[in-house]
């Protein structure tokens, strides 16, 4: 599957406001989302599995890749396209042994050293951040800004997406770095019109 990282949605059910996750993901895809990561913190394995399976029904229908945050077992159980790992999650080399060469593995990085290490270890793409202050992620060590993003982007050759505080007012500045995509949570999920919110983050509307 050819991967378009252009508009990368990360799920967070705290923003649902009573809406169905499947419907929200579908509207986001119809608005222009090109890849979906299912992220669930502090839930049981069974609940995570059920949520991921539900989202995969939508992504399969629209032929959009689905990535699972952190949990290799969930990724395997639903036959996801891949996983996204943080610096403290399963080591990339071990994840590759478990998932095989055909699955996508993305790594979160916050500096050039981490980016080069992930690239050299065989990451398929990088999530670079945190770019701007954000309310979605509380354990942010450092805001790297556009300058930090540019330095990391210039040091690597694999695809990457920017994450952290990206919204409709600043996303064009982020894309000027040549990054392959932007990764968002609240910029889409916290809006009343999901489809329009996604569409507002497309550079070529």
Swiss-Prot record:
EC number of this enzyme: 2.5.1.3
Keywords, comma-separated and alphabetical: Magnesium, Metal-binding, Thiamine biosynthesis, Transferase
Pathway noted in the entry: Cofactor biosynthesis; thiamine diphosphate biosynthesis; thiamine phosphate from 4-amino-2-methyl-5-diphosphomethylpyrimidine and 4-methyl-5-(2-phosphoethyl)-thiazole: step 1/1
UniProt xrefs under CDD domains: TMP_TenI
GO molecular function list: magnesium ion binding; thiamine-phosphate diphosphorylase activity
Database matches in Pfam families: TMP-TENI
Protein name stated in the entry: Thiamine-phosphate synthase
Species per Swiss-Prot/TrEMBL record: Clostridium botulinum (strain Loch Maree / Type A3)
């Amino acid at each position: 599957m050819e991967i378009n990282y252009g508009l990368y949605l990360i799920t967070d059910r705290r923003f649902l406001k009573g809406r169905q996750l499947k419907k929200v993901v579908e509207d986001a895809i119809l608005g222009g989302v090109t890849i979906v990561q299912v992220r669930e913190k502090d839930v049981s394995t069974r609940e995570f599995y059920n949520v991921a399976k539900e989202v995969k029904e939508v992504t399969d229908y629209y032929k959009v890749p689905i990535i699972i945050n952190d949990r290799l077992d969930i990724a395997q159980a639903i036959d996801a396209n891949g996983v996204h790992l943080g610096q403290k999650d399963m080591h990339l080399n071990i994840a590759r042994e478990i998932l095989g060469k055909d699955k996508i593995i993305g790594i979160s990085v916050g500096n050039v050293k981490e980016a080069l290490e992930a690239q050299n270890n065989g990451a398929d793409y990088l999530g670079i951040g945190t770019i701007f202050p954000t309310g979605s992620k509380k354990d942010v060590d450092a805001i790297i800004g556009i300058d930090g993003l540019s330095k990391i982007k210039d040091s690597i050759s694999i695809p990457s997406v920017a994450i952290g505080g990206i919204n409709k007012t600043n996303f064009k500045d982020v894309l000027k770095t040549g990054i392959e995509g932007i990764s968002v949570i609240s910029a889409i999920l916290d809006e009343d019109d999901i489809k329009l919110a996604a569409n507002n983050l497309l550079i070529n509307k």
